[in-house]
Regions:
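Phosphate/diphosphate ligand-binding glycine-rich loop within oxidoreductases
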Residues: 1-63, 189-191
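Gly/Ala-rich phosphate-binding loop of Rossmann-like dinucleotide-binding domains
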Residues: 14, 90, 94, 196
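General beta-strand structural signal in soluble alpha/beta enzymes
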Residues: 21-24, 41-45, 76, 127, ...
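Short, acidic/turn-prone active-site loops that include or flank metal/cofactor-
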Residues: 45-50, 105-108, 206-211
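Glycine-rich phosphate/diphosphate-binding loop of Rossmann-like nucleotide-binding domains
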Residues: 64-143
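Rossmann-like adenosine-cofactor binding region
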Residues: 119-195, 200
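C-terminal helix-to-coil terminal segments
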Residues: 197-225
């Protein structure tokens, strides 16, 4: 960019392409782009707001691994305040009558407006500081990294950066046989490498699922079936 406005950029790009895939650090930019674009816009993540394309591959992975999306017990662990993947997947799983467990320090716990949406939908949720207390109950353990780039105060990041880390011995024999571990990636220290060899670890398959899911999204956006 050479100083032009965001709106001008979108207008120009939409005249060159059949679809726009946008990732932007500011909340709401995908909607801003969609409002003025002459071609379909796919939101690949806007700030701390939403990440719907990730959610579609998450849903696909859950369906493939567990056989259905209905009434699953899902625990989100880590940065829930700024984690856009968590926000989007929570809203999606709401339609399948999931039960939610939100595991995080108070300073990065789930935003109140999303908790209110769950209450209005009549869905169960609970807040926790430690995932160990609910590990035996859940179908899905959804880990996230603590995102340094989301913190304005470095001291606040330092307080929570190592809040959660799972090791192989934390999982094996302590969870249900069918439980799966997901992560939007990249991981930092929140999942030990030793966990990779567990049958519960499905985050690399989850990432691989992103290729066909996103291909399908683009195909639908440009009118192909």
């Amino acid at each position: 960019m050479k100083g032009e406005s965001f709106e001008d950029t979108i207008r120009m790009v939409s005249s060159y392409s059949d679809v726009i895939v946008i990732r932007h650090p500011q909340d709401g930019t995908a909607q801003r782009a969609a409002n003025i674009s002459s071609v379909p816009v796919i939101n690949a993540g806007d700030g701390k707001n939403e990440h719907p394309s990730q959610t579609l591959l998450d849903l696909y992975t859950i369906q493939e691994e567990l056989g259905s999306l209905e009434e699953k017990k899902i625990a989100f662990v880590g940065d829930l305040k700024y984690g856009r993947t968590v926000h989007s997947l929570t809203r999606a799983m709401k339609h399948f009558r999931a039960k939610f467990y939100f595991v995080a320090p108070d300073s990065i716990q789930m935003p109140q407006y999303l908790l209110q949406e769950l209450e209005e939908a009549g869905l169960e949720y609970s807040l926790h500081r430690h995932y160990e207390e609910i590990l035996s109950e859940i179908d899905i353990l959804y880990m996230t990294r603590i995102q340094k780039e989301r913190f304005e105060d470095p001291k606040e990041f330092e307080k929570v950066e190592s809040a959660y880390r799972i090791e192989k011995e934390d999982i094996v024999g302590r969870c249900q046989e069918h439980m799966i571990i997901l992560h939007p990636l990249p991981r930092v220290d929140e999942i030990a490498v030793s966990v990779d060899e567990c049958k519960h670890a499905r985050y690399f398959q989850q990432a691989a699922n992103g290729v066909p899911v996103r291909e399908a999204m683009i195909a639908l956006a440009v009118g192909k079936k």
